[in-house]
């Protein structure tokens, strides 16, 4: 019988899994924000398209199988625009769905979201503009209002073996807030560079896996191209 109690760290195998290496952790919650609606929308569409088709993402080169995605934009009247954005990135829309909510309030929507996740079994869940269904948009920045939502999303990510990405424009969230820091493992920001490109940088990394910035451009049709 092996009674060894000393284990060298060289024998330790990392257990963390990634949907997008060092940016979108598996079974966890990430946050994406930026001042450009077009850039954030195109980046989300590119991520979703890559997952739906089983393609590698920039500076990733991970071999992945095609997976399902729930893409929920809480702004009214966005379904046609979302589909057009996904088609521009050559996504497989048969692997992408949204939940037809019977409610309007944020927490009720999040509770109902679980049924959609359980039924569709997505690899990725993207929730965009969730502030639109909160009582006040500024409630997104209130830790007491966001804590139960974030806690429930973290449960979904672990229970249903998926990554969850929250996306907003121009947030004022304090990333060091206890509830936010305990739940959201990766925070990414889209910024415009002087060269006319957009830069995706990680502004917070709770998993201690720093990753290099990536750049992309938008063409006249708002289609994303990696630089």
For every predicted segment, state its role.
Residues 18, 80, 111, 151, ...:
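Residue-level marker for well-ordered alpha-helical positions
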Residues 31, 37, 41-42, 72, ...:
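Phosphate-binding/switch region of NTP-binding enzymes
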Residues 62-148, 218-220:
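Conserved inter-motif catalytic segment of the P-loop NTP-binding fold
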Residues 49, 114-117, 151-154:
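A structural alpha-helix within SAM-dependent methyltransferase catalytic domains
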Residues 1-26, 93, 107, 111, ...:
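Core recognition of P-loop NTPase motor domains used across DNA-transaction enzymes
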Residues 1-91, 180:
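The Walker A/P-loop phosphate-binding site
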Residues 58-59, 93, 97, 164, ...:
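Secondary-structure transition/capping residues
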């Amino acid at each position: 019988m092996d009674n060894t109690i000393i284990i060298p760290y060289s024998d330790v195998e990392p257990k963390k899994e990634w949907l997008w290496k060092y940016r979108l952790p598996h079974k966890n919650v990430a946050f994406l924000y930026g001042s450009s609606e077009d850039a954030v929308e195109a980046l989300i569409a590119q991520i979703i398209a890559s997952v739906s088709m089983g393609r590698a993402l920039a500076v990733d080169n991970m071999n992945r199988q095609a997976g399902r995605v729930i893409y929920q934009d809480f702004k009214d009247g966005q379904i046609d625009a979302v589909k057009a954005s996904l088609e521009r990135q050559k996504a497989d829309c048969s692997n992408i769905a949204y939940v037809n909510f019977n409610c309007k309030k944020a927490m009720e929507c999040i509770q109902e979201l679980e049924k959609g996740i359980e039924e569709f079994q997505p690899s990725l869940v993207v929730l965009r503009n969730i502030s639109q269904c909160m009582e006040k948009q500024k409630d997104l920045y209130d830790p007491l209002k966001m804590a139960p939502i974030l806690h429930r999303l973290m449960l979904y990510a672990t229970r249903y073996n998926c990554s969850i990405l929250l996306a907003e424009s121009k947030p004022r969230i304090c990333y060091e807030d206890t509830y936010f820091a305990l739940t959201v493992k990766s925070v990414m920001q889209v910024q415009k560079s002087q060269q006319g490109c957009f830069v995706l940088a990680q502004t917070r990394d709770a998993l201690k896996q720093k990753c290099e910035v990536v750049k992309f451009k938008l063409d006249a049709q708002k289609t994303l191209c990696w630089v």
